[in-house]
């Protein structure tokens, strides 16, 4: 019983590593937005919606990792 509980905690902690990847992805999206806007300020209106889409996709991947972690902790 203790081994199964330890495996559950280890699996949940490994699943949360994806949150770090999502954070890095979000940072890279906004770094690219700042670089693009600083190089050509007139493109801000076209770059910003694409950056928000990239943010949403990166955040969704992070939330999926968090959801899997919670499922491993509380549903299995």
Curated annotation (Swiss-Prot):
Task: Tell whether Electron transport is among the UniProt keywords.
Answer: no
Q: Which Gene3D superfamilies match?
A: F1F0 ATP synthase subunit C
Asked if the keyword tRNA processing belongs to this entry, the reply reads no
The name on file for this protein is: ATP synthase subunit 9, mitochondrial
**Gene (name only):** ATP9
Pfam families linked = ATP-synt_C
The record's listing under InterPro entries reads: ATP_synth_F0_csu, ATP_synth_F0_csu_DDCD_BS, ATP_synth_F0_csu_sf, ATPase_proteolipid_c-like_dom, F/V-ATP_Csub_sf
List, in alphabetical order, the Gene Ontology terms for molecular function in this entry: ATP hydrolysis activity; identical protein binding; lipid binding; proton-transporting ATP synthase activity, rotational mechanism
Where is the site described as Reversibly protonated during proton transport found in this chain? 59
Q: Which GO terms describe its biological process?
A: proton motive force-driven ATP synthesis
Q: Look up and give the membrane topology term.
A: Multi-pass membrane protein
Kindly list the residue ranges recorded as spanning the membrane.
14-34, 52-72
Entry GO terms, CC:
mitochondrial inner membrane; proton-transporting ATP synthase complex; proton-transporting two-sector ATPase complex, proton-transporting domain
Q: What quaternary arrangement does the UniProt entry report?
A: F-type ATPases have 2 components, CF(1) - the catalytic core - and CF(0) - the membrane proton channel. CF(1) has five subunits: alpha(3), beta(3), gamma(1), delta(1), epsilon(1). CF(0) has three main subunits: a, b and c.
């Amino acid at each position: 019983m203790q081994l199964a509980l330890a495996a559950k905690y280890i699996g949940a902690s490994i699943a949360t590593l994806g949150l770090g990847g999502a954070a890095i992805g979000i940072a890279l999206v906004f770094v690219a937005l700042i670089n693009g806007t600083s190089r050509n300020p007139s493109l801000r209106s076209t770059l910003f919606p694409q950056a928000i889409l990239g943010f949403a996709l990166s955040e969704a991947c992070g939330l999926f990792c968090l959801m899997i972690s919670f499922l491993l902790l509380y549903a299995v």
